[in-house]
């Protein structure tokens, strides 16, 4: 079938991964400064690569990887899941010799294409499989709490155990407590197994979830995977991945009583009644013990195992019943997750009411993984990006950028798309699909212009990986305050969906720090105890420096940590109790870009000064002169959308700032003019001196790469979107080509022009006089015409690519059976079975074009 093949027309491109980001184009500098960062493979975006049923073959693997490489992908992470209906004969059992052969083929192809190979350490999630015996499966405890006469022997009581537990439950502890009126309270604690099976498991991966608190069980689990590599001579991947902790109801392990006594200094058995009744201290100690066990017996052991085989680990710690900072810091690449779409209110950004869900990961949640990376000196923080950003088939490139920019400002610099489904090249559209959108693959119409997004990511991450973090404050993570709350339910999992309930005060503190113009990283007890004060700064064991530490008001701290903080203060460290703005300003310089104008930023230091990533995620343009918190004399703007450098107007520490709603920039500051590439220009004024509205002129509209074929061209008296033009146009997906002519006088031809496309649905490549000037794929949809416009007649060609929404709705109306995956198949954003037959036509194309001169 026809696919959306990537074609690269851009005149502004990134050089090879091991070269520098070099701008090519008439308005770009001819040579980049030698002190600016190199672009590496790690700066490119990665893909979570779903293998449905592991039903892959070498020909299609090579085709897929080739398409990913052409689009600008730098890494793939293989995650096998459930298969496709009626395709059982093609399924490949996980870790079988055939499966390992496919992995070797991927590794060989990726070496040729310079793509990094990663894989989940199992199928679906969490860790588990058929090789996990019930004795090593996730464990739980429950109690039967009863009141009986004191003359009754507790051992004689026939406790009412739930039927579903009788086969697995073992009496672990029986305790009696005298009560008034000749009664006694008897508590029986039973140990059982959750019997949770691996979610979304692939063939050969179905089985029990492993006990993450049991070091022996985890070791046995990893040994099974290791055996498959050793027996087949398959090279280990670059990276092993672990998804978010979703081991539900696992609140116990057989060794917990002894581990508790060793770590907490008293026997939990002696406090069983207090534990059952939810005593805050006892439950907090229990939760801390679980945290220690998942950290040491699972996360650290898994990472050590990967290192033994020359691999590294990438981990989502959220969901763990642990101090997230400790678990994130125990791996090589901590990874956070976005889940839903943030409503920033950006002007001109399309909204799709009823087809999106709120983003559970606000700035405070996104900062957990970057904090661990910063504090422990790890170079990369990754992200599971765009999970459930919108409903299936309705996600645009423009909707991706704002939430991505927020992740960048939180500290992410090594993003992964969630996700991409392996689908055979010739499978009828829409091919194989994963149930949680988005779909970043050649099966999606937006793939045509996805290389523009890929290039943007690569350029941003090149700078976000350069240098060192330069956040102002450490903030003590008050995990014990959280552990001491909601104690009737022993298990406390720190998943992104419930953090607003578990840590509302902490979230408020972090957002207040941000609004005051500062940035911060979270720190745990363990990492704080190894932090010292030297040279006027707090310095972590990894060498990351901070101007002070903020202790949230009234939080519970262990005595040794409290004494260490006091000792740091006695040495001269700035210790701030609460988060009073004045106290913070006495310790560090705020960034008025944040406090006055609401911009989101992250600042990093480098050998020559500092650099910023700045995003205007507000509903208004920002044009102002603002002081910077740093003192360098020279500034340079880098636009990662266009790959163009310009001199920044930086006078006596005041920066002239001009960012439209939705725009982002990189600012480089140094005390040397060596930062300037050869031929760099001054920043151009954005003041318009005239407009030419060509919306109502004569236009032609034709189609390329569309499915189904429209079969005709249209002559338009004014611009309009094409879903209203007829039955075939209303259901097609692909690219509509708008063409017109405009005449310029001699005086107008001397002006510098931009082209404003208004509300693009969804991305638009623009050619003027057959010269490609750029792709408008994100808000604001404005492009620089460079010197393409001439005196007299000028041809304008705009290739607009729409979403696949109208196409899939048409298939549902016709009863086409494309939902052919097993298990959960395809569901809507609320995890419900659905049809798209009732969707109204989604706008496709453009309605306005204005040339703006200055």
Q: What feature does the model see in each segment?
A:
Residues 34-39, 720-730, 815-854:
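Non-catalytic, glycine-rich low-complexity segments
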Residues 32-75:
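Mature N-terminal segment immediately following signal peptide/propeptide cleavage
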């Amino acid at each position: 079938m026809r696919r959306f093949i990537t074609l690269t027309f851009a005149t502004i491109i990134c050089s090879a991964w091991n070269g520098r980001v070099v701008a090519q184009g008439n308005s770009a500098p001819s040579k980049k400064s030698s002190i600016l960062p190199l672009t590496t493979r790690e700066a490119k975006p990665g893909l979570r690569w779903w293998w449905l049923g592991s039903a892959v073959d070498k020909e299609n693997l090579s085709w897929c990887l080739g398409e990913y490489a052409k689009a600008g992908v730098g890494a793939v992470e293989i995650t096998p899941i459930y298969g496709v209906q009626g395709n059982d004969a093609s399924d490949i059992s996980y870790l079988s010799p055939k499966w390992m052969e496919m992995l070797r083929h991927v590794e060989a192809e990726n070496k040729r294409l310079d793509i990094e190979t990663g894989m989940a350490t199992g199928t679906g999630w969490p860790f588990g499989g058929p090789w996990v015996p019930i004795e090593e499966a996730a464990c739980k405890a429950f109690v039967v709490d009863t009141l009986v006469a004191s003359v009754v022997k507790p051992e004689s009581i026939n406790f009412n155990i739930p039927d579903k537990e009788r086969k697995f439950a073992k009496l672990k502890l029986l305790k009696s407590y005298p009560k008034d009126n000749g009664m006694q309270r008897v508590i029986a604690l039973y140990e059982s197994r959750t019997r949770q099976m691996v979610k979304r498991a692939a063939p050969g991966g179905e089985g029990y979830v492993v006990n993450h608190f049991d070091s022996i069980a985890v070791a046995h689990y990893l040994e099974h995977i290791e055996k498959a590599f050793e027996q087949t001579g398959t090279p280990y991947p670059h990276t092993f991945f672990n998804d978010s902790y979703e081991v539900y109801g696992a609140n116990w392990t057989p060794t917990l009583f002894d581990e508790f006594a060793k770590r907490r200094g008293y026997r939990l058995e002696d406090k069983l009644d207090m534990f059952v009744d939810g005593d805050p201290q006892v439950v907090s100690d229990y939760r801390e013990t679980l945290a220690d066990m998942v950290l040491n017996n699972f996360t650290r052991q898994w990472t050590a195992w990967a290192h033994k085989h020359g691999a590294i680990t990438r981990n989502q710690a959220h969901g763990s019943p642990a101090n997230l900072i400790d678990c994130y810091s125990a791996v090589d690449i901590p990874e956070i997750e976005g889940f839903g779409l943030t409503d920033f209110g950006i002007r001109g950004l399309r909204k799709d009411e009823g087809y999106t869900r709120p983003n559970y990961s606000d700035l405070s949640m996104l900062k957990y993984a970057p904090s661990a990376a910063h504090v422990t000196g790890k170079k990369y923080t990754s992200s599971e990006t765009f999970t459930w950003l919108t409903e299936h088939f309705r996600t645009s490139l423009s909707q991706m950028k704002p939430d991505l920019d927020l992740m960048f400002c939180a500290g992410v610099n090594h993003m992964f798309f969630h996700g991409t489904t392996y689908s055979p090249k010739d499978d009828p559209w829409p091919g194989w699909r994963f149930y949680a959108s988005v779909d970043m693959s050649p099966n999606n119409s937006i793939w045509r212009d996805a290389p523009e997004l890929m290039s943007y990511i690569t350029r941003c991450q090149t700078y976000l990986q350069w240098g060192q973090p330069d956040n102002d404050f450490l903030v003590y993570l008050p995990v014990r305050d959280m552990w001491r709350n909601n104690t009737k339910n022993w298990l406390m999992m720190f998943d992104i969906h419930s953090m607003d309930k578990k840590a509302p005060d902490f979230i408020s503190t972090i957002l207040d720090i941000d609004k005051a113009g500062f940035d911060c990283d979270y720190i745990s007890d363990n990492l704080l105890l190894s932090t010292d004060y030297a040279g006027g700064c707090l310095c972590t064991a990894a060498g990351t420096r901070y101007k002070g530490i903020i202790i949230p008001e009234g939080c519970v701290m262990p005595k040794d940590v409290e004494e260490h903080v006091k000792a740091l203060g006695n040495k001269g460290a700035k210790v701030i109790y609460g988060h009073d703005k004045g106290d913070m300003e006495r310790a560090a310089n705020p960034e008025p870009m944040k406090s006055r104008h609401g911009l989101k930023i992250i600042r990093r230091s480098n050998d020559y000064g500092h650099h910023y990533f700045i995003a205007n995620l507000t509903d208004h343009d920002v044009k102002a002169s603002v002081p910077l918190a740093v003192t360098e004399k020279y500034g340079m703007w880098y636009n990662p959308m266009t790959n163009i450098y310009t001199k920044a107007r930086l006078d006596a520490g005041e920066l002239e700032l001009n960012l439209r709603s939705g725009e982002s920039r990189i600012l480089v500051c140094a005390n040397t003019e060596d930062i300037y590439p050869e031929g760099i220009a001054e920043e151009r004024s954005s003041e318009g001196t005239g407009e030419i509205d060509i919306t109502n002129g004569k236009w032609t509209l034709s189609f390329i790469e569309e499915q189904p074929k429209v079969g005709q061209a249209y002559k338009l008296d004014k611009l309009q979107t094409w879903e209203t033009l007829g039955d075939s146009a209303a259901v097609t997906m692909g690219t509509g080509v708008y063409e017109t002519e405009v005449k310029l006088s001699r005086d107008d031809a001397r002006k510098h022009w931009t082209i404003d496309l208004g509300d693009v649905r969804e991305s638009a490549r623009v050619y003027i006089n057959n010269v490609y000037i750029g792709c408008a794929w994100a808000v604001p949809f404005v492009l620089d015409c460079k010197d393409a416009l001439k005196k007299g007649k000028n041809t304008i060609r705009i290739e607009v690519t729409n979403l696949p929404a109208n196409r899939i709705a048409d298939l549902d109306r016709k009863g086409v059976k494309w939902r052919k995956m097993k298990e959960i198949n395809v569901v809507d954003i609320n995890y419900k079975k659905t049809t798209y037959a009732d969707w109204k036509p989604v706008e496709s194309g453009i309605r306005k074009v204005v040339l703006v001169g200055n």
